[in-house]
Regions:
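Acidic, metal/ion-coordinating pockets
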Residues: 1-203
Length: 203
């Protein structure tokens, strides 16, 4: 199983997983800003996770910049935030902007177990939390995001769902989808979600 965000040492932990399709390379880089014990973080000569705390974020930023310089589209997968809190912390918003300034094209967060909003920065989208894909507890709202890079453009479409009893189910009826999109717009930052789930910045 391909993985990113952890390894036998810091160099291994920061390595991306790179996919190529139709001549376009996409680099996925995983990291965390939630580490229960300091010893879980990867360092030179010590296995662990790629840390994204403010005092340890430089290796991640350097890896983002390196992938960007190689012509790859960069997706940062970041574990952060407060569990069950639908509002992103200010540090999440600040870190996401640092990732984008370093060259990231898309930021996708996890850990809160609930939806958090979407924001654009310099034309690049930030998904602060998608909710749960598969988890033991139940949450009424969760989602997937389909992201497609075409040249310099990125299209985004949401797949809304609900999760309970360890199962995630897609929403299928139009009314439930509309309510979901309206809710997500309400917790986001200057973002529009169309009836078809297409995400775009508000003009």
């Amino acid at each position: 199983i391909l993985h990113t965000g952890a390894g036998k040492d810091l160099n291994a932990a920061k390595q991306p997983v790179v996919f190529e399709k139709n001549g376009q390379k996409v680099a996925l880089i995983g990291a965390t800003r939630v580490i229960p014990e300091a010893g879980w973080a990867a360092t030179n000569g010590h296995p662990g996770m790629l840390s994204s705390y403010e005092v340890s974020v430089e290796p991640l930023l350097q890896q983002i910049a390196s992938c960007h310089a190689d012509g790859e589209k960069v997706v940062v997968l970041i574990h952060w935030g407060i569990e069950r809190d639908e509002k992103p912390q200010e540090y999440q918003r600040a870190l996401a902007k640092r990732y984008i300034d370093a060259g990231a094209d898309l930021v996708i967060g996890s850990h809160p177990h609930v939806l958090q909003g979407i924001e654009y920065y310099k034309g690049k989208p930030i998904f602060y939390s998608l909710g749960n894909f598969v988890f033991g507890s139940s949450i009424p709202k969760t989602m997937l995001v389909q992201a497609a890079f075409t040249g310099e453009s990125l299209s985004l479409q949401l797949i809304p769902g609900t999760s309970s009893g360890g199962y995630t189910r897609m929403l299928t009826d139009a009314e439930s989808k509309t309510q979901f999109y309206q809710y997500l717009e309400g917790i986001s930052f200057g973002v529009s979600v169309g009836e078809d789930g297409i995400v775009s910045p508000q003009p």
